[in-house]
A protein has these predicted regions:
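SAM-dependent transferase fold signal centered on methyltransferase-like domains
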Residues: 1-395
Length: 395
């Protein structure tokens, strides 16, 4: 293990490749570890803990966690140490050296008995569990290199009723409108390259997963999502119910965006109409999830239990709490946002502060909020033309 070094992340000791801490792009050899994804893992630990606090284990099943692309175990081992309600953690990877390293890290943390390791292709690993519903995993995490789309059905078939799936996508160019045909093939919808493409991307992941789930008689409900320059991540609660699965289309629709005047709106129906403001052709993204993205009651409970004022002195915890705080107030029933810069550009003037713009929109009778997707973004049910009129009047 000369090429590895011991670090501590959260409360967990990890053996990680030295090169992954020294190089700008973490190498895949001898095993992959991304130190920049710590925020991703920290957020996950909070979500898993609060989910299991509210988890209704009526069948008294053993609570299990599956890390399908486990790598060196950075997520799965942290769950074993930092999520006490989980009884068994299954860590899988195709890289034998990564699993050997994960086993060594498990020994360092004295959690050998809680961890089961396997070296297998992802779908073979997931379906290796008995198919009876009471033998499925409570939580399944899918964090592949690139698109999660080839593995979604395997994940859905391996998770129990009322369980949780967490999914990461790193094919950012596809989901951000650069390769639209690829996006349509993988995510059943068109992406778009504009200021709010990261929210469109996140909603495409939710919608494509929900459509596959519906075919299996499974309904999904987002409890939290977030994005980073390098990835998009969603947490979805699972309900095995044909009647609920039939309702999936109630939460699907299309976003129409005018690149000329900045107008945007959304509809449940696909239509190639023209912009009502400037008569230009709309660019359409979707079919995508237009429903809500956050379980705000759960997030409020999370903040109260784990991120009280006394626990937020740490800079990382402050950043995480800020994300959760914003999500609680976010207008997540609106599937896009505006940015301060684009509003300033349309007005041909220096933009006002975000808080001031939100205040003026609300004072004019509209709803408005910040968004988790961009520090300079705002959500509102006002149109771009409404926003510009409001800000011009109040200058």
């Amino acid at each position: 293990m000369d090429n590895f070094i011991q670090i501590t992340e959260g409360q967990t000791k990890l053996l990680v490749p030295k090169n992954s801490l020294q190089e700008k792009v973490p190498p895949h050899y001898p095993a992959f570890f991304n130190p920049l994804a710590r925020l991703n893992r920290d957020l996950s630990i909070y979500i898993y803990n609060i989910f299991l606090e509210e988890y209704n284990n009526i069948k008294n099943n053993q609570i299990t966690f599956a890390d399908a692309f486990g790598g060196i175990g950075s997520r799965g081992l942290r769950v074993a140490v930092e999520v006490p309600k989980v009884s068994k953690i299954y860590i899988n990877d195709i890289n034998e050296l990564a699993i050997i390293t994960a086993k060594e890290s498990a020994h360092l943390n004295n959690i050998d008995a809680k961890c089961i390791f396997s070296i297998n292709e992802v779908c073979k690993f997931l379906i290796s569990r008995p198919t009876e519903r009471n033998k499925r995993f409570t939580i399944v995490d899918l964090d592949p290199f690139g698109s999660p789309s080839p593995f979604i059905e395997c994940v859905l078939r391996s998770v129990e009723d009322e369980g949780l799936i967490s999914i990461t996508a790193t094919d950012t160019a596809v989901l951000s409108g650069i390769y639209q045909n690829v996006c349509l093939r993988k995510y059943f919808g068109l992406s778009i390259n504009n200021t709010y493409s990261n929210e469109v991307a996140t909603r495409l992941i939710v919608s494509s997963t929900a459509l596959i789930a519906a075919r299996l008689g499974i309904s999904l409900r987002p409890i939290f999502v977030h994005s980073n320059r390098h990835y998009f991540r969603v947490f979805l609660k699972v309900s095995i119910s044909n009647s609920k699965a039939n309702m999936v289309f109630d939460n699907l629709g299309y976003i129409k965006h005018c690149f000329k005047c900045g107008e945007r709106n959304f509809s449940s129906i696909y239509s190639k109409d023209l912009c009502s403001v400037c008569s230009s052709k709309f660019n359409i993204s979707g079919q995508l999830w237009t429903g809500k993205l956050f379980d705000k009651t759960m997030i409020l409970n999370l903040i109260k239990k784990y991120l009280s004022d006394d626990s937020t002195n740490d800079k990382k915890n402050q950043q995480i709490k800020q994300l959760f705080d914003i999500s609680v107030d976010e207008l997540d029933d609106i599937p896009y946002y505006f940015t301060v810069d684009e509003i300033g550009s349309m007005l041909r003037t220096s933009p006002k502060k975000l808080s001031k713009i939100i205040e003026e929109i609300i004072c004019s009778g509209y709803r408005a909020s910040r968004t988790i997707f961009r520090p300079t973004g705002l959500k509102t049910n006002a149109s771009m033309s409404d926003i510009l009129s409001i800000l011009k009047i109040r200058e």
